[in-house]
Amino acid sequence: MEYLIGIQGPDYVLVASDRVAASNIVQMKDDHDKMFKMSEKILLLCVGEAGDTVQFAEYIQKNVQLYKMRNGYELSPTAAANFTRRNLADYLRSRTPYHVNLLLAGYDEHEGPALYYMDYLAALAKAPFAAHGYGAFLTLSILDRYYTPTISREKAVELLRKCLEELQKRFILNLPTFSVRIIDRNGIHDLDNISFPKQGS
C-alpha cells in the first residue's frame, strides 16, 4: 500500500515517500509525513502497521538524540542503522514485535552519504538505491537500469520522477502526492512535493 524510495549520489541521498495514511481500504489523510529526523544529517523513513511506525520511529529518534546529549556528538548513519537494527531484532524476539519497514539515509563527514534498507525481520543492507512497498516491484528495475554511482542531483530527481510516473501508470492504488527530501553535508533539505492529478479527473 505504501511506498518509500531512496537514491544515493556521490555527495547526497535523495529520498521520497507517499503521504497517504490509510486504515484498511480507507484513506484517512493525504498529508501524512513518513520521515523522521534522527539528527541533523540522518533521516528515517518508516512504513508498516499504523501504530508501530510512529511508536518505533520515535523511540529510535529519542534514543539517538539522547546519545548526542550524553556524549556530545551524533551517531554516524552506520551506527544509527546498526542501533535501529538491533532494537528491531530484539523486539522481533519479544511478545510485542514491530511490523515496520525502514530506509535510513544520512551523511557523515568521514564516510560520506549512506543509504540503508531494513525490513520488518531486521535484515539490514547498505544499498545505492532502495524501495519499500508494492511499488518497489514496479520501480526497482527502473532504478537498476538508469542509476549510476556518479548521478547528479538533477538526474536523480528525474529518475525519481520516472519511478513515480511508473507507479501512477501501473499501480492499482492511488498515491497522488510524495514528500521529497535530500540529505547532504549541510543537513536535511525539503524539496518540492511531487504531485499527480487524480486518475480520471
UniProtKB/Swiss-Prot annotation:
Gene3D superfamilies: Glutamine Phosphoribosylpyrophosphate, subunit 1, domain 1 (3.60.20.10)
GO cellular component, one term: nucleus
Superkingdom of this protein's organism: Eukaryota
Subcellular location: Cytoplasm; Nucleus
PROSITE patterns: PROTEASOME_BETA_1, PROTEASOME_BETA_2
InterPro entries cross-referenced by the UniProt entry: Ntn_hydrolases_N (IPR029055), Proteasome_beta2 (IPR035206), Proteasome_bsu_CS (IPR016050), Proteasome_sua/b (IPR001353), Proteasome_suB-type (IPR023333)
Keyword list, A-Z: Acetylation, Cytoplasm, Nucleus, Proteasome
Entries under CDD domains matching the protein: proteasome_beta_type_2 (cd03758)
Modified residues (N-acetylmethionine): M1
Main location: cytoplasm
GO biological process terms, semicolon-separated: proteasome-mediated ubiquitin-dependent protein catabolic process
Function description: Non-catalytic component of the 20S core proteasome complex involved in the proteolytic degradation of most intracellular proteins. This complex plays numerous essential roles within the cell by associating with different regulatory particles. Associated with two 19S regulatory particles, forms the 26S proteasome and thus participates in the ATP-dependent degradation of ubiquitinated proteins.
PANTHER family named in the record: METALLOPROTEASE TLDD, PROTEASOME SUBUNIT BETA TYPE-1
Family, as annotated: Belongs to the peptidase T1B family.
Quaternary state and interactors: The 26S proteasome consists of a 20S proteasome core and two 19S regulatory subunits. The 20S proteasome core is a barrel-shaped complex made of 28 subunits that are arranged in four stacked rings. The two outer rings are each formed by seven alpha subunits, and the two inner rings are formed by seven beta subunits. The proteolytic activity is exerted by three beta-subunits PSMB5, PSMB6 and PSMB7.
Protein name (database record): Proteasome subunit beta type-2
